[in-house]
């Protein structure tokens, strides 16, 4: 595969021939894998298309909008039906007023837990922004955490290899008698593999056979949507009780301007939505202003394609950075469970240089230099390269990382894999 002709820009004009050849030679070697990714995208696109068709999505749904209470918004209600059908679960609620993946997860946890019950995290410490939701960081501030609410917390750490510790989980089920077992599929800011649907299914089986009666399995599914073809964590073939995620990641297709979802058991979805709005009103309230329904529906339709491009980007990032001698997870040849690629850079300067290179190659704010800082919800300084059309969208080309050892950068998204290819030219030059 030959590199494309150069064009004047702040980043490509400085790329050396060697940096270009490193990237495009890696892309050429990945061509057969990219073709397999395209076939997977086609199969998942068919599944989304069939869900739209079965629910008779029409122009009146796409063009519908609501204000005030939002009661009777046919577009919003049809969006929920499409998601429920697509993910093969009892209920799904997709809402613009879920502000983040963390917000969706918090709604699920507060809905499923009651004072005096126990939450068992089966994948170690929760993601940074969830620590203050649970109450493991910022305790005593009275901010309305699960801990403030009287929910006990316990965790089972992953193994040194980043796998679930099944023996310790079984012991934890017996010892803590949890009401909820929580699983985070993606790596977060940890240098470990993403967990598969097989891992989720195994946890569900373990909880059903060895856990206390009524124990529920909740899954943080951020970055996991539309990757594995068999379904999603809440699908009947896997069996989790509830999954939560963000529309400015995979299912929004880089078009949804905001929002998130909860999906799974009907009773748990209702309880989660009661935390989002109020008990009683639940899913019947919540306006979708202007073109919100169109943008979310269109993004959901495009999601298999944008995820497919992000998966190809993930493989290319891994191949290029492996070639430069860096540790990468997952390796370029490994199966993908999400589209996050973690690169262990080893020091602060390389982390900042990597993010600067990606920011320079972005369509938005290419002239801005990323600097580390304290971001609400995070305990450490974090640096972000996010020249995106939707603020904070990690379905678009982005990378970020905390300023702590091992100074890994976490790369996501890309509306087309060639966007990351051009950015990697700049990364290679800077490193």
Briefly describe each language-model feature range.
Residues 65-66, 92-96, 339-344:
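Short glycine-rich or small-residue beta-strand-to-loop segments that form or flank ligand, phosphate
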Residues 1-17:
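N-terminal mitochondrial targeting presequence
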Residues 63-93:
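Active-site-flanking structural segment that lines cofactor/substrate pockets
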Residues 18-31, 38, 48-59, 71, ...:
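Conserved PLP-enzyme active-site core in the AAT-like
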Residues 14, 19-26, 33-47, 51-52, ...:
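Alpha/beta catalytic barrel-like cores
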Residues 98-99, 286-289, 337, 372-375:
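Short linear loop/turn motifs
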Residues 322-431:
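Conserved C-terminal alpha-helix-loop-beta "cap" of PLP-dependent enzymes
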């Amino acid at each position: 595969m030959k590199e494309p002709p150069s064009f004047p820009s702040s980043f490509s004009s400085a790329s050396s021939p060697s940096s270009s050849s490193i990237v495009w030679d890696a892309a050429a070697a990945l061509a057969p894998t990219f073709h397999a990714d395209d076939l997977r995208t086609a199969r998942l696109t068919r599944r989304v298309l069939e869900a739209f068709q079965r629910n008779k999505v029409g122009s009146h749904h796409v063009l519908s909008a609501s204000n005030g209470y939002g009661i009777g918004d046919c577009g919003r209600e049809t969006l929920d039906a499409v998601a429920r059908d697509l993910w093969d679960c009892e209920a799904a609620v997709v809402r613009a007023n879920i502000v983040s993946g963390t917000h969706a997860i918090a709604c699920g946890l507060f809905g499923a837990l009651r004072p005096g019950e126990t939450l068992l995290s089966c994948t170690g410490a929760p993601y940074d922004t969830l620590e203050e939701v649970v109450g493991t960081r910022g305790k005593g501030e009275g901010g309305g955490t699960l801990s403030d609410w009287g929910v006990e917390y316990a965790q089972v750490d992953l193994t040194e290899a980043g796998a679930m510790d099944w023996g310790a989980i079984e012991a934890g089920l017996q010892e803590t008698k949890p009401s909820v077992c929580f699983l985070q599929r993606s790596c977060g800011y940890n240098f470990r593999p993403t967990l598969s649907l097989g891992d989720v299914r195994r946890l569900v089986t373990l909880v059903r056979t060895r856990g206390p009666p009524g124990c529920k399995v909740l899954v943080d599914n951020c970055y996991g949507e539309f990757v594995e073809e068999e379904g999603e964590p809440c699908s009947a073939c896997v069996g989790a009780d509830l999954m939560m995620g963000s529309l400015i990641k995979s299912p929004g297709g880089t078009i949804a301007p905001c929002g998130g979802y909860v999906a799974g058991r009907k009773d748990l979805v209702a309880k989660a939505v009661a935390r989002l709005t109020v008990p009683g009103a639940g899913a019947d309230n919540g306006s979708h202003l202007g073109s919100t329904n169109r943008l979310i529906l269109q993004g959901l339709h495009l999601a298999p394609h944008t995820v497919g491009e992000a998966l190809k980007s993930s493989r290319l990032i891994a191949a290029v950075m492996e070639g430069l001698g860096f540790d990468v997870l997952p390796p370029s040849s490994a199966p993908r469970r999400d589209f996050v690629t973690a690169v262990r850079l080893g020091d602060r300067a390389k982390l900042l240089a990597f993010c600067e290179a990606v920011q320079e190659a972005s369509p938005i704010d290419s002239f801005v230099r990323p600097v580390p800082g304290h971001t609400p919800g995070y305990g450490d300084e974090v640096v972000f390269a996010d020249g995106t059309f939707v603020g904070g969208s990690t379905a678009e080309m982005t990378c970020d990382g905390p300023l702590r050892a091992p100074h890994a950068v976490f790369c996501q998204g890309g509306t087309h894999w060639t966007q990351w290819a051009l950015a990697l030219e700049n990364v290679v030059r800077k490193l």
